[in-house]
Regions:
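Catalytic core of soluble alpha/beta enzymes
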Residues: 1-113, 117-125, 136, 144-151
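Short helix-capping segments at alpha-helix termini
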Residues: 131-132
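C-terminal extensions of enzymes
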Residues: 144-169
Length: 169
């Protein structure tokens, strides 16, 4: 049904409040139960790596992605990456990574880290320009309203018609 496009396993986090230890039986159920979904950030170890041997095309990475170098350090060249601009040290590093991925046909999608205000506008602008049709996790502010109106923007997000810098107006 395409209702689930990405499943985040949180296996790359260590020492945080969102850590999820590797769970081979759960990973196997996810792989089999959601055959079309991307699988984000599995923890790869002796027990779990074999589960993903035939699933490289579905594995996407988020937490470790901060630069071109971190993409190159992945266990295999990915087909998908979750780009969270707030993880990059500079706009230059962000754009170098996007360019690197475009040159290698690595598909991108956008993610956020609870950005509100101007940060949310930035991730919308980037998503609309570089990965508008991807399974983005960058909902417009209106979706966070406790009483949303019926006039919510739909995907894909269109780029701003009169952009100023990275603003979304």
């Amino acid at each position: 049904t395409d209702a689930v496009r990405t499943l985040d396993l949180k296996g790359q986090y260590h020492g945080t409040t969102v850590d999820q230890p590797a769970d081979p039986p759960l990973y196997e159920r996810i792989i089999e139960g959601f055959p079309e979904a991307l699988i984000e950030d599995p923890e790869l170890n002796e027990e779990t790596r074999p589960l993903f041997e035939c699933e490289h095309a579905r594995v996407t990475w988020d937490y470790p992605i901060r630069s071109v170098e971190t993409v190159e350090d992945l266990p295999w060249e990915p087909e998908w990456l979750n780009i969270k601009p707030s993880r990059f040290g500079s706009v230059q590093s962000l754009f170098e990574t996007i360019e690197y991925c475009q040159e290698r046909d690595i598909q991108l999608f956008g993610g956020g880290q609870f950005e509100l205000d101007v940060g949310r506008e930035h991730i919308h602008a980037l998503a609309s320009l570089f990965y508008p049709n991807a399974p983005n996790d960058v909902a417009p502010k209106a979706y966070n309203d406790p009483d949303p109106s019926g006039d919510l923007p739909a995907s894909p997000l269109a780029p701003p018609s009169a952009p100023e810098g990275l603003s979304w107006t």
